[in-house]
C-alpha cells in the first residue's frame, strides 16, 4: 500500500521553478502595469529572474 504524500500546491508550482542546485527561481513583481513612472533601467532589472532566499526556499519546497 502506498504511503500518504502531500499534494502539490498548484499556485506555488505555477510561480516557482527549481534550479539544478535546488534553489527556487521566481519572477520579479511590479512589472505588469502602472510602470510608466519607473525608469527604463528599473524595468530592465525587473525582467531578470530572482532567486529566493534560503529561509523561504525551505518553506516553499514542502509545497512543491
From Swiss-Prot:
Entry-linked PROSITE patterns: RIBOSOMAL_L35 (PS00936)
Annotated InterPro entries: Ribosomal_bL35, Ribosomal_bL35-like, Ribosomal_bL35_CS, Ribosomal_bL35_sf
UniProt-listed GO biological process terms: translation
Domain of life: Bacteria
UniProtKB keywords: Ribonucleoprotein, Ribosomal protein
Record SUPFAM superfamilies: L35p-like
Signal peptide (residue range): none
CC annotations in GO: cytosolic large ribosomal subunit
Keyword Mitochondrion: no
GO molecular function, one term: structural constituent of ribosome
Family, as annotated: Belongs to the bacterial ribosomal protein bL35 family.
Protein known as: Large ribosomal subunit protein bL35
Gene that this polypeptide is encoded by: rpmI
